Amino acid sequence: MAEINAYNEAIKSGLYQKPTGLLGKYDNVRRFWEDEELGLYLRPYLEQMVARKRERGQRLRILDLGCGSGDGLEFITNIISSKSSISEHDTEIIAPGMLELYQGIDINEGLLTQAREIHDHRPNVCFIHSDFNDFDLGAEEPYDLYLANYGTLSHNTDEQTVELLTNIARQSQHGALIIIDWLGRYSYEWRTLWTKDTGHNRWMKYVISYLPAVDGEKPPELTYFPLRIMGREEALYIYQQVKDKTGGLLTLCNLADRSSFVGRHMDTAQYNPHCQPLRRLVNSLFEPNVSTNLDEVLIRYIPRDGFTEVNAYHQRLADCWNYLVTCTQALLEGSKPPEALAEMPLPLRQLLTTMEDVVRVAAGMEVGNARASLVEPQLGYCLRELEMRLQQGQGCGHGLVAIFEVVK
């Protein structure tokens, strides 16, 4: 009986479950594609900021808007320095001693309870229950970095976002950074929602239908809620309003798409019946000791009439993606590679060389499953790199990322 109770206690803790990156909020795409992609977009600006603070003997103050369970803390402290070598193990830009304060704000008390349970052991981390639009920035010491990741500001009206960014610009010191992530207007996931009348179609009815049901439990009734979807011109209009209100205190550093063809609703086909479960398949690429059918990773892009520029971006990325996957498959099989595309962008050619090197090394390995644990994860990283280097910041990914700097 004691043994049974001991194992039951372990099961209830949730720590006795088989780990997997194939499903859930923290799946492989979230950790190895999305978190790292956001970090790579932010990295050059973050490195400059940290270098300035270090020269002055100062530490970083971070404010996470809509922090949820505190994921932003792990995200920001895990960004790797661009100058680190393969021999190093302490490679984070923000070393433990560089963080003065991480403060998270969220309106959801349940998520804040979870955040406190996770980070309670850290003395320089705290969480506040509040609507971040109502938070008095003037009552606090200025922050150096403001996070609003994973669609946080898609909960805001444009007027609220302009007011928030205006307050941040006025209250912050020179060099402060802001990273925002809206839902992209022209993500392939919601092809049925594409419109040219952006003034009257700012919102989508979003539903979290992609998380698996708990074993043995009836799936809960799903709740739809409004989220702002954002294209490039709309984001630039918001930026211009903030510049006008602040006298130019805010500079746009980067506007970029993320998670093209791997957003969560690719697997549900909730808003586009033509979607393939590409997120599940890319999760499989990153999963150790799991081999993936690469034929299924090929994108079958279905254009929508009337959206020439959007279709051109998606089709170009799909063609390059498919060529990289097909060539990798030919390398693994030792078969003839496909004919070159009419256009072979430099990023594609460079990534093909990378995969040739990876497969060559894997072919000589006699330990472990070289395909599943070396070739496929590297293919996943190369597909991510392909997206990053071909994207145009048009709102064609699941997220549209904006990075701003305060200039005084």
Regions found by a protein language model. Give the residues of each.
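A short acidic, Gly/Pro-enriched loop at the edge of an enzyme's catalytic core
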Residues: 138-146
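Class I SAM-dependent methyltransferase Rossmann-like catalytic core
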Residues: 5-54
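Class I SAM-dependent methyltransferase SAM/SAH-binding core
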Residues: 70-134
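Conserved class I S-adenosyl-L-methionine
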Residues: 59-68, 178-207
